[in-house]
Amino acid sequence: SVISDKVALQKSSNVYMFKTALKVAGITYGQQSINGVTAADFQKMRNGYARFGLGVETGIDLPGEFTGVKGNETLPGKYLDLAIGQYDTYTPLQLAQYVSTVANGGDRIAPHILKEIHEPSENGKTLGRLDKEIEPTILNHTNNTQAEYNQDHKGMSMVYNTPSGTASKFFSDAKYKAAGKTGTAEVIYYGPKKEKYGTYSIT
């Protein structure tokens, strides 16, 4: 059946995301073989994700930031995995930056450890004089329209606040309104015993 972009978010439709990714690659589902996917198509998807902070440095004011792991195969099936977040890996901070970029209408803002620096308190009860205030740093603005973001906001709200939403059962009794997107974390399991290469169980 045909579903809208909002319902695709609400129900976490992999098929919708697959078809969208194939359109990005110039392939019409059902009429062409997906073997036409190229390495350039993978990069095009990653370039789009990077505008939201996925797979790149978030700009946090700490050294040695890890940017996740990019898959090195370019098989068509891996391209579809990439479309639903099941190929490249991302850090929790990257995921937070991506969601905040969607939430605020396209500004990707660098996260900071500090908001303000104050002088020592003179009375032990109130903050001392403000010495420095950390201003938000906008790293880039995505090229999506506000109308597109409005659709995203509605769809992500439906995930949490409608009976068919994939997160609704966890937030049905919440005293606040939430929005977002659910996902399935992958687990790598090598078995309960020590392997011949000296590795233990990894989850």
Segments from the language model and where they lie:
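Beta-lactam-recognizing serine transpeptidase/beta-lactamase-like catalytic domain environment
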Residues: S1-T203
